[in-house]
Amino acid sequence: MIFGSRRRIRGRRGRSGPMTRGLSALSRAVAVAWRRSLQLRVVALTLGLSLAVILALGFVLTSQVTNRVLDIKVRAAIDQIERARTTVSGIVNGEETRSLDSSLQLARNTLTSKTDPASGAGLAGAFDAVLMVPGDGPRAASTAGPVDQVPNALRGFVKAGQAAYQYATVQTEGFSGPALIIGTPTLSRVANLELYLIFPLASEQATITLVRGTMATGGLVLLVLLAGIALLVSRQVVVPVRSASRIAERFAEGHLSERMPVRGEDDMARLAVSFNDMAESLSRQIAQLEEFGNLQRRFTSDVSHELRTPLTTVRMAADLIYDHSADLDPTLRRSTELMVSELDRFETLLNDLLEISRHDAGVAELSVEAVDLRTTVNNALGNVGHLAEEAGIELLVDLPAEQVIAEVDARRVERILRNLIANAIDHAEHKPVRIRMAADEDTVAVTVRDYGVGLRPGEEKLVFSRFWRSDPSRVRRSGGTGLGLAISVEDARLHQGRLEAWGEPGEGACFRLTLPMVRGHKVTTSPLPMKPIPQPVLQPVAQPNPQPMPPEYKERQRPREHAEWSG
């Protein structure tokens, strides 16, 4: 028996599961529709408020009608019982030869016979009569009619000499249901004679039920009409708003000629006119900005190309002088070194301007080949390693033991890494810089982590802006132009990859480059976290299969050979 009951309970739960899920899905759908549909909210609120008003009004009107009907019934009953008391007094005082019970029964029969319509029924309608003389000592009480239907509270008032009435539910031979019972003491030769009239409220109840039904039907019809009116009225407002939303979306997509139709002179028409004026102004400004941007890019490209030829000539002359600087006096030798250094910086600026103009014009192209990215990282380290040695900064390198083959433009990826490492050295505050690489089936990631000044909130986006610097007064050992990270993020996007930054003041910063292993694939996740371990390991990370460090990594080179790649 126990196991059987468990199976039944489990079956009931199994059947309730789909119902619960269905109700949950329905509630979510209703919640979504409520949040997204202004028309639904307007109609629902209109129906809710209208329903509250109709219920309140219906309650008040029903109460008024009920009280009015019952008041008429009570006044008619009072008139009826006054006439009945006179009739009873006449019958009881008429013949002394009749017994008390006979007199009471005769009086009751006389009263009830008057309720026949043919004999002139009272205004209060049909009723039943109860006559009673309470017992006194050894004498028993004398009654006529259904005395047990008279409430004790009402009998107490009548016994005290007061006329009173009360609503009660009675059950007699000819009627069962709510009734009005009115009682009064009667003056006659029989002391303490009490008269009660029972008036059925069937017709009044039917009238009240009819009124309530009529009001409910009218309220329902009115509610439906109000819903339709609210739907139509809200549609007059929602349709133009939806049209404006669709046109705004198309405008945001680049369809600058989209405009709202103007109909009439009402508020919606003024909204359409204002929207069209705004769209016209925005389209003009966008066109002007696009034209200005094109001119700016063309100017940058033209200037960069025009300066290339004289710069090459000056470079050749400077190199010739530099090669014979040993024969010059110290002052001229130092001037030659400064001239070569500034030419390196100027050439780097031209190269960066040319590269950023290619990205702006959309003509930058990838030269994709399958390469081992570990070699690319080592090449980048070899080109900027001398900056770390000069600053006394330790580079901690953690590369996979196996090859990491990816389809990338090795030149652009190496440039990204050089910019990131040089930027980390500039901001490391003589603390170690960690370079890590990891790969999975789809993506490869390289992080460059420093433990220096870090980034303030919001600067992780600004750091990729052109010519932006967190602290303009900081001395940059890499001699960057301010375009390195801007070019790097464009190179990463060209690979359909991501270049992201994270930092906290005083905790350092981390730049993460994530690239797809296969050209054309999109990056969705990264094998390396954005937030590295906050405390650096001061010893170099031991590689499972250490690779020999390129000789140029320790060799101090001329600054101009690396200035092109500094950020």
Swiss-Prot record:
Q: Does the keyword Glycosyltransferase apply?
A: no
Q: Where mainly located?
A: membrane
Instruction: Kindly provide the PTM information from the record.
Output: The C-terminal domain (residues 234-567) autophosphorylates.
Q: Which residues carry this modification: Phosphohistidine?
A: H305
This protein's record includes keyword Lipid metabolism: no
Where is the protein localized? Cell membrane
Quaternary structure annotation from Swiss-Prot or TrEMBL: Interacts with MrtA. Interacts with LpqB, probably extracytoplasmically via MtrB's sensor domain.
> What name does UniProt use for this protein?
Sensor histidine kinase MtrB
Q: What organism does the UniProt record list as the source?
A: Mycobacterium tuberculosis (strain ATCC 25618 / H37Rv)
Tell me the gene name: mtrB
